[in-house]
Amino acid sequence: NRPYIRSKLGMSLDGRTAMASGESKWITSQDARRDVQCLRARSSAIMTGAGTVLADDPQMTVREAELPCELEAAPSIKQPLRVVIDTHLSMPAEARMLTLPGETVIFTASDSKSPKVMLDKAGARVIYLPNREREVDLPAACQLLAEEYEVNELLIETGATLSGAMLRAGLIDEMKIYMAPILMGNKTRGLFDLPNIECLDQHFPLEIVDIRAVGRDWRITAQPIYA
């Protein structure tokens, strides 16, 4: 039992998501970013990784001013649950999302007491959920979100490390890939961290179910085909 999991990704035409420094604002257009707000608005929770929090300090909220008019005029937009995968409990208690209304849940594989106390005081709920490799147990985390928080749609907005881990675990049901008409070169970061792929036979097949223009960008909807 787990939510339907949708991964939102932004990339250049040559498949890059950020500069080597981590700079990624903005690859895609404002139209694409408005479209992402619709994905957030329909999601019960938004998940990211500690690396994204440290690099970007995201709000992880639905920004109503950026929604299309028909959604912006809705009586109320419920803010999604914020979820952070933080293996080493490195997220600062001063993170911007912890100053905003709504709940934040942090899954960790670290039993360090001091950062947990600080994050608890900041209003987050820290859940210790390690697997055998001393990383966060991602399937168990998704199951807990469904059973304890009644999350039925989970949106992932994160970097290549967590995106790759979720894909390798068979936990991504759908990808929304926003492709910008720019080239970023080879000294940049890719979409997924998939270290075990050494030959073409080990590729991850996808089914493309929709492609459409969003402003100057293209939105590709794809579903992984798991063996």
Give short role names for the model-derived ranges:
Residues 3-227:
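Enzymes that bind and transform nitrogen-containing heteroaromatic metabolites
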